[in-house]
A protein has these predicted regions:
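Alpha-helical transmembrane segments in inner-membrane proteins
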Residues: 1-332
Length: 332
């Protein structure tokens, strides 16, 4: 990694921390940040004023937005390399549809909620991991070069059909909860909820980071990588599982927030090039920045006088849609 790449990663890491810090100031109600932080760090909860309580509500969602954005952007970069498809996203293999199906089962059938408030994220996570394992199993049995992609698309349709069936059978109250889930949210209740995806993100990154040089070789040519001693099949399976864990861990707690895993890796490549040693860390920090800013727009935007925030999934789609069209035009 050259000096310019190191400087870029350092700048992005500092920028992400500064943006996260200052994002706590803004919302429908502005606060005196320094006073709120002073009380939050030095006074017991019972002595906090309104500003500090608002800070305590905003901080978990900023943490969750940073983790979710970083994980989805990293997973998107890995998926684009492994599938050799610049339009691949973390949701290409059906993980988001499977996660939504698992969460919707709990919302539609409260009897399944045996784990309390953690039931919906847990079922979502299990369904996502099941989808990922099925994709790998089916693709390993296929002799087609595009077997992995086709298996993912097929399961995406199947779980999507399951989602539509559950929504059709749900009552209006359950349907409203499902709609909120589909729009995505980083509205974490507390810091424990905000950091709940962290173990899955840590496991995913622990598999990806030691294999960055292998990603460079896989991106160039798999046959040459195999000739150089890279265990191509094993590494591809491990990296797919890692990116799946990143995605599943996030979707279970935020719902499917689109375009982050597509937009951020392409934007970062304009500055880092194709080397994954710079691309992966830069994607993580840039994804965190993008998601924090999207959440900031979401919670400061009021539409048609409604006393509610704009769903973050709508914000990312508004930004990501035109970028997607631009990417298609450039590819043509």
């Amino acid at each position: 990694m050259n000096r310019g790449s190191l400087f870029l990663i350092a700048a992005l890491s500092i920028a992400s921390l500064l943006i996260a810090f200052f994002a706590t100031c803004f919302g429908t109600i502005s606060i005196n940040q320094m006073e709120a932080w002073r009380q939050w760090l030095s006074l017991p909860t019972s002595e906090w004023d309104q500003q500090t309580r608002i800070l305590a509500l905003r901080l978990p969602r900023i943490v969750l937005a940073w983790l979710a954005g970083g994980a989805l952007a990293t997973a998107g970069a890995v998926m684009q390399t492994l599938l050799r498809n610049s339009l691949a996203t973390p949701f290409t293999l059906g993980i988001a549809s499977a996660g939504s199906f698992g969460a919707f089962l709990v919302l539609a059938m409260p009897g399944l909620a045996i784990f309390g408030s953690m039931s919906s994220p847990l079922y979502s996570l299990l369904a996502s991991l099941l989808c990922l394992l099925l994709v790998l199993k089916i693709s390993n049995r296929s002799n087609r070069a595009d077997g992995l992609l086709l298996a993912g698309i097929t399961l995406n349709f199947l779980f999507g059909a399951g989602v539509m069936l559950v929504r059709y059978l749900a009552d209006p109250f359950q349907l409203a909860s499902m709609e909120r889930w589909m729009l995505g949210s980083v509205n974490a209740v507390n810091i424990n909820t905000a950091t709940a995806p962290l173990p899955w993100i840590a496991i995913g990154l622990a598999f990806i980071l030691p294999r960055i040089s292998a990603l460079d070789q896989l991106a160039f040519d798999e046959e040459i990588a195999a000739a150089r001693g890279v265990p191509v099949k094993r590494y591809k399976t491990q990296l797919l599982l890692a990116s799946g864990l990143l995605t599943a861990g996030v979707v279970a707690y935020t719902g499917p927030i689109g375009f982050v895993g597509l937009l951020v890796p392409h934007a970062v490549r304009w500055f880092t090039g194709l080397r994954h040693g710079a691309l992966i860390p830069a994607c993580f920090f840039s994804g965190g920045i993008f998601m924090i800013l999207a959440d900031l727009v979401a919670r400061t935007t009021e539409i048609a006088g409604r006393n509610s925030e704009l769903p973050i999934g709508i914000v990312t789609a508004i930004v990501g849609g035109p970028f997607f069209l631009l990417l298609l035009i450039r590819k043509n």
